Curated annotation (Swiss-Prot):
Belongs to the bacterial histone-like protein family. SUPFAM superfamilies: IHF-like DNA-binding proteins (SSF47729). Keywords: DNA recombination, DNA-binding, Transcription, Transcription regulation, Translation regulation. This is Integration host factor subunit alpha. PANTHER family: DNA-BINDING PROTEIN HU (PTHR33175), INTEGRATION HOST FACTOR SUBUNIT ALPHA (PTHR33175:SF2). It comes from Escherichia coli O9:H4 (strain HS). It comes from the Bacteria. Residues 49-72 are annotated as: Disordered. SMART domains: BHL. Transmembrane segments: none annotated. GO terms for cellular component: cytosol.
Length: 99
């Protein structure tokens, strides 16, 4: 099962009594703020959850799997997520759900 933004909005609607429009806007604003911070090169720390970091990867040699031809993989910036200790602990201790 996958948790979607629509399901998050529905949860806020049910639990907090927000209108569906306000719940959807709150979820969108939350993720937009994370996107904005990362686009500006900032780290995002969510206490009790984890950190979103930016990492610069250097150019490196690669290979086309179909032709075997050597090709360079260009340098790029990637987003990484490191879960916090509380999240790690809760996930490790959670009982698995059947899908």
């Amino acid at each position: 099962m996958t948790l979607t933004k629509a399901e998050m909005s529905e949860y806020l609607f049910d639990k907090l009594g927000l209108s569906k429009r306000d719940a959807k806007e709150l979820v969108e604003l939350f993720f937009e703020e994370i996107r904005r911070a990362l686009e500006n090169g900032e780290q995002v720390k969510l206490s009790g959850f984890g950190n979103f970091d930016l990492r610069d990867k250097n150019q490196r040699p690669g290979r086309n799997p179909k032709t075997g031809e050597d090709i360079p993989i260009t340098a790029r910036r990637v987003v990484t997520f490191r879960p916090g200790q509380k999240l790690k602990s809760r996930v490790e201790n959670a009982s698995p759900k059947d899908e």
